[in-house]
C-alpha cells in the first residue's frame, strides 16, 4: 500500500527522475523570481497552485504530476470557488481505490 502524503505544503518530497527534477526546478524558479511580480495573492486554492504543481510532480512524477498541475490551473478562475485541494495520494487512481 502507498504511504499517504502530507497535506503540509512545507513537506515536499524530492522529485524522482530527471524530468521531474527539471520540472520541479522550473516551478521553484517561478516561485522565487516570477510569482512576486504579481500584485497580491491571486490563487484561490490551498495549497497555492505552484506548491500544488511542485508537490504533484515530486510525488507522482513528471507526466502524471504535469497533468494534475494542468487540471488544477484549468480550475483556477472566477468560475471555481477554490478552497482546500490537496495533491492526491499515490495509488489514488488504482482500480482498488476508485471502485
UniProtKB/Swiss-Prot annotation:
Statement: the UniProt record of this protein carries the keyword Membrane: yes
Domain of life (superkingdom): Bacteria
Membrane topology, record value: Peripheral membrane protein
Keywords: Cell membrane, Membrane
SMART domains: Haemolytic
Chief localisation class: membrane
Subcellular location: Cell membrane
Protein biosynthesis found in the keyword field: no
Assigned GO CC terms: plasma membrane
InterPro entries named among the record's database cross-references: Membr_insert_effic_factor_YidD
Function (record text): Could be involved in insertion of integral membrane proteins into the membrane.
NCBIfam families: membrane protein insertion efficiency factor YidD
Family: Belongs to the UPF0161 family.
Protein name: Putative membrane protein insertion efficiency factor
Native source species: Corynebacterium efficiens (strain DSM 44549 / YS-314 / AJ 12310 / JCM 11189 / NBRC 100395)
